[in-house]
Amino acid sequence: MLAGCQPSDTSILERGASVREQIRGVNAGTTDTIDCDEPIRSQADWELLRGVKQIRSFTLREGIAGDREASIIGSLTSLERLSLRHSPLGDDGFREIASLQALVALNIPQADCTERGLESLSSLPHLQSLRLGSSRLDGLRACEILATFPALKSLHLIDIHIKDQGLLSLSECKKLRSLYLDNAGVSQEAWGEYIIRQPLVHVHIDQAHHDRDPIKNHPSAVESK
């Protein structure tokens, strides 16, 4: 049994409950959340998750999920919030995640996907919040794909070099209200043009507000956990 997984509601399960205990809680209807602060390394523990219908929020704070585990995550059809830290999902894994049609928020800061994997997420009708990092993404093409996401309101890109043209492509995201970029390689001139095109978007660059951000006190919807 794996220790170190804890639910958000400690009145239901004691802090430090194992992933198996949390799954039992979900199946019993006492919680809809699984929150693990240590890696799930046992394939047997992963298999216990397959097809569990009542999970709405699943968080791995220390990983580790790859493409094989993504096939199990993709079977959690009620999932609305998914956070996979230290999890190098590739394109196959992203295609599995794209089957989660109820997904609203996705956080995969250490992914290993290309544009093909990212494009598969454009089919998610309710995805409002995305936090993503992958060294394999072409920045401009990634932004062109993100501009097609139908419901995206909050976006955080980590170490993806979108440069000026990528930022201007993101101005086509008409529903976007919060944009966080870390190490994006964008010039001040491009930021000026973006703010003219998208005056309602809260802008945060390299962990700081842009000095021309028109909405400095906007509460970001992007998960940073």
Regions picked out by a protein language model, each given a short descriptive name:
Residues L2-G4:
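C-terminal motif of bacterial Sec signal peptides marking the signal peptidase cleavage site
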